[in-house]
């Protein structure tokens, strides 16, 4: 909404801007649960879960303090998303003009498309945990990563803010089979789970294009990384000719050979995700994001120490006068079995 010079700004007008601001900075959809409906998903992608700006009553005078609640939240939001603008706060006694209102709307329009993006320098990586497996494995090794959020909405806020969960594998020591697995780990790269997708720092993976918003209580495949070695191809051809007539002799013969072979071992990493709600209810109580990393191959007696590193790339906290922005990281636990 654009205001013309001289237009009277009412409580209804103010509340409309507050609602748009809170939709991003706070949460207008607190009853969210996993959804498949595109409209519902689109709505639930809004919201960082911070303290809302105040809605005012009809007939209330729009004061500098009220307007500054909106301005402060938009300035923090613009900083976080890498926006183009920073608004000046209103001084007590200053007239609230149409120009100020239009500037606020401009900033909202700038921030909204980037609500799920954290600008460069607005996140920080921290290690949540390491799962090390050193007892060897045959054919299959499975890592279980449990990331506990106090509610489904807390998980939403984490991923809506542009925060991600990162996974990478490494090995120390071990036999030839372990060294082959180390090559697979390099191919896999660092995997990042975001709101809408699961990707890697390399191009060697097959993503299912699913992120946090796609997850529910059913386990789903998120990503695959394959490595195959070995193969052979052979081709042979021979020709001879002969015949005989009186004192002249000539011979004929023909030979042809063809061969093809494909051998070696296939090693594969698959990553799965699901959400586990307390007592099966997403609407109340804690929710665990479970990531399962499965290594499979024909290899037997793989030795060495194989470790899965789990990191949080979380939006950093920031403040601007009356507005404070903060995202809570999940509580980590992990295990492995072969």
Regions found by a protein language model. Name each.
Residues 115-181:
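Solvent-exposed, flexible loop/coil segments flanking beta-strands in beta-rich domains
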Residues 205-338:
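Extended, charged low-complexity segments
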Residues 172-183, 296-306:
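Short, surface-exposed beta-strand/loop "edge" segments at domain boundaries and coil↔beta transitions
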Residues 177-214, 337:
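Large, modular interaction/toxin scaffolds in secreted and membrane-associated proteins
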Residues 1-130, 134:
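Extracellular "spike/adhesin" assembly and maturation modules
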Residues 14, 104, 165-169, 193, ...:
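Generic structural hydrophobic/aromatic packing signal, biased to beta-strands
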Residues 155-157, 163-174, 182-187, 217, ...:
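Long, compositionally biased low-complexity segments
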Residues 96, 124, 132, 139, ...:
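Polar low-complexity intrinsically disordered regions enriched in Ser/Thr and small residues
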């Amino acid at each position: 909404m654009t205001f013309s010079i001289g237009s009277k700004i009412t409580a209804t007008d103010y509340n409309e801007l507050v609602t748009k601001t809170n939709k991003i900075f706070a949460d207008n959809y607190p009853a969210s649960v996993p959804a498949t409906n595109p409209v519902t998903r689109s709505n639930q992608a809004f919201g960082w879960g911070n303290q809302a700006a105040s809605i005012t009553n009809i007939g209330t005078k729009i004061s500098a303090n009220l307007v500054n609640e909106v301005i402060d939240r938009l300035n923090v939001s613009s900083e976080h998303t890498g926006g183009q603008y920073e608004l000046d706060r209103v001084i007590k006694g200053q007239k609230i003009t149409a120009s100020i209102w239009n500037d606020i709307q401009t900033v909202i329009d700038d921030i909204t498309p980037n609500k799920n993006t954290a600008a460069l320098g607005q996140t920080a990586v921290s290690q949540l945990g390491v799962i090390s497996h050193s007892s060897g494995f045959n054919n299959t090794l499975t890592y279980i990563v449990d990331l506990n959020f106090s509610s489904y909405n807390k998980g939403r806020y984490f991923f809506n803010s542009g925060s991600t969960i990162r996974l990478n594998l490494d090995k120390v020591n071990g036999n030839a089979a372990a060294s082959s697995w180390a090559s697979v780990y390099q191919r896999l790269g660092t995997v990042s789970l975001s709101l809408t997708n699961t990707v890697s720092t390399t191009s060697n993976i097959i993503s299912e294009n699913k992120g946090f918003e796609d997850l529910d209580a059913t386990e789903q495949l998120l990503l695959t990384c394959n490595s195959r070695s070995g193969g052979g191809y052979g081709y042979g051809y021979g020709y001879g000719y002969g015949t005989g007539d009186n004192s002249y002799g000539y011979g004929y013969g023909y030979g042809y050979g063809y061969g093809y072979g494909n051998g070696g071992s296939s090693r594969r990493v698959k990553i799965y995700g699901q959400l586990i709600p307390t007592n099966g209810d997403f609407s109340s109580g804690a929710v665990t994001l479970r990531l399962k990393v499965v290594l499979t191959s024909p290899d037997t007696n793989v030795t060495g120490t194989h470790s899965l590193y789990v990191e949080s790339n979380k939006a950093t906290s920031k403040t601007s006068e009356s507005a404070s922005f903060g995202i809570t990281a999940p509580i980590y636990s992990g295990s492995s079995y072969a």
